[in-house]
Amino acid sequence: MQESGGSSGQGGPSLCLEWKQLNYYVPDQEQSNYSFWNECRKKRELRILQDASGHMKTGDLIAILGGSGAGKTTLLAAISQRLRGNLTGDVVLNGMAMERHQMTRISSFLPQFEINVKTFTAYEHLYFMSHFKMHRRTTKAEKRQRVADLLLAVGLRDAAHTRIQQLSGGERKRLSLAEELITDPIFLFCDEPTTGLDSFSAYSVIKTLRHLCTRRRIAKHSLNQVYGEDSFETPSGESSASGSGSKSIEMEVVAESHESLLQTMRELPALGVLSNSPNGTHKKAAICSIHQPTSDIFELFTHIILMDGGRIVYQGRTEQAAKFFTDLGYELPLNCNPADFYLKTLADKEGKENAGAVLRAKYEHETDGLYSGSWLLARSYSGDYLKHVQNFKKIRWIYQVYLLMVRFMTEDLRNIRSGLIAFGFFMITAVTLSLMYSGIGGLTQRTVQDVGGSIFMLSNEMIFTFSYGVTYIFPAALPIIRREVGEGTYSLSAYYVALVLSFVPVAFFKGYVFLSVIYASIYYTRGFLLYLSMGFLMSLSAVAAVGYGVFLSSLFESDKMASECAAPFDLIFLIFGGTYMNVDTVPGLKYLSLFFYSNEALMYKFWIDIDNIDCPVNEDHPCIKTGVEVLQQGSYRNADYTYWLDCFSLVVVAVIFHIVSFGLVRRYIHRSGYY
């Protein structure tokens, strides 16, 4: 393994990432059926990684092989520092210790399953992510150029305007790879990049990685080369004229050993280097966990790592692995896939006891003292490199909020059909309530009860519609939030604020539309100002309900659990809302209810100016003569500030719900890794 000390041949020393004595522990999942006993019993830990040590240098394409549960993904996440929890050991770059934030700047992690917004096109997704992943001073033209290079480099030219949900599995995998290449990282970590792909797509993905690791040509491509010769309008409205300054694309000749498989495949061009990237003088290095690769794919890897039981039992060049096994008496059969042979040998009881132990001992012996001599001389170089990387400046927080709001609204527009269906049912409810209470007329004793019932239904419908409409949000979005926030794409606070703000215009629109249908048949005699004030209050109730719904959503990682646990909260809020019981009997508790603030403000606005209510001739029945008496009967306040105090209270309740919800989501995000 003396090769590690060499130069990259690209204008500077090689960058080498070394991991030393990595150990990872997780709690034992074996539990008793009795929760009390689970709390009292001593917690045990399982050791997932055991003294894992190794290295990778620029130019390497490494495959991590092992059976199920061998620790492949855990090792990948530990090296890339995307793993949280009880992890011990060191990760160093040319002998210098690496912090988590430094690692995320010089590396990218390609997850096993694609995590992105499915309603975006391939171009839109990459262009959107370029705003977050490129330096804040990068111009829009440079971002569009980078996206053009990426789409061509990963072979997605013809799918640039296709929505992600319509792409094939191989295309989605290559799009995910293109996203990770936006920052021009030195190290690529790929978790089973061929899973779920056919042999051709799997080969093309690994071949793309081989290109990135073995070449560093600068190849700039015009937008016309990516999107065709026709004029293409960019998101900013600019048009790329046909044939203006287009450069020919250099294509690589397919290796003879794979001509039969790829005879129709045009080779992918090398990717251009970012103008402000410190990585331009380096090859890349990629390390992939991979499950049962074909022989064609296996031959693309320059090195392999074999794992068994959380231990590394071999690391070395791909072509040298057969000799190691042969020396131990395990001859590689003719016409046999080497990867299958190695895994079968390790899985065999005899091979697991003999070959695994001997290979592990040999590996530990050869890696002892690996980073002495020339690598120590490269420390100052890697230090300068890290300083350059740390000069990266992300876009400002307020711009993150703006871009995320654009993404949320774009998703809603792309899913307009389901949105219209939901809005249709919402309006059916409004029409139904309007027909039920359309007989209200005059100011009589009957009107008091009917108006109270209609206002109660208005409040209920707005709160329940918006609270239950958002309970699914965080359980569905946690994977993408955990990954993008963990990678430093944007801050969690920016995501949360953008999410909340995106609901505000919807709340006001639906609040006034819903009230319009009912107001036209029930309250029209009271004037336009009452309509405006009631609509504003209903909209605030919807905003507060969003906070309540998001709170329920953040309590659990399952939307089903969130919906089921909402029932006791709903019951408490309804009881203390002022309709089902006299809230004066439980002073103080009424202020916990959203329904109380909403009902009180709506009732106040309707009744406070009413000075005369008709009484029946029969004096044996109680008679309410003024609007103030109506409010007093319902235990509602009648002071001049009541309406605005309730509006302010709804805002405060919403803020409290959001603060608690943000804390819960933050706990979920930082509790586990983002890989």
UniProtKB/Swiss-Prot annotation:
Record topology, Extracellular segments: 441-460, 519-531, 590-644
Keywords, sorted A to Z: ATP-binding, Membrane, Nucleotide-binding, Pigment, Translocase, Transmembrane, Transmembrane helix, Transport
Recorded superkingdom: Eukaryota
Domain ABC transporter: 34-261
Chain segments annotated as coiled-coil in the UniProt record: none
Comp. bias (Low complexity): 236-248
Record GO cellular component, one term: presynapse
Region annotation (Disordered) ranges: 229-249
Binding annotation for ATP: 66-73
Entry's Gene Ontology molecular function annotations: ABC-type transporter activity; amine transmembrane transporter activity; ATP binding; ATP hydrolysis activity; ATPase-coupled transmembrane transporter activity; guanine transmembrane transporter activity; pigment binding
Major location (coarse): membrane
Transmembrane segments: 420-440, 461-481, 498-518, 532-552, 569-589, 645-665
Membrane topology: Multi-pass membrane protein
Family label: Belongs to the ABC transporter superfamily. ABCG family. Eye pigment precursor importer (TC 3.A.1.204) subfamily.
Name used for this protein in its record: Protein brown
Gene that this sequence comes from: bw
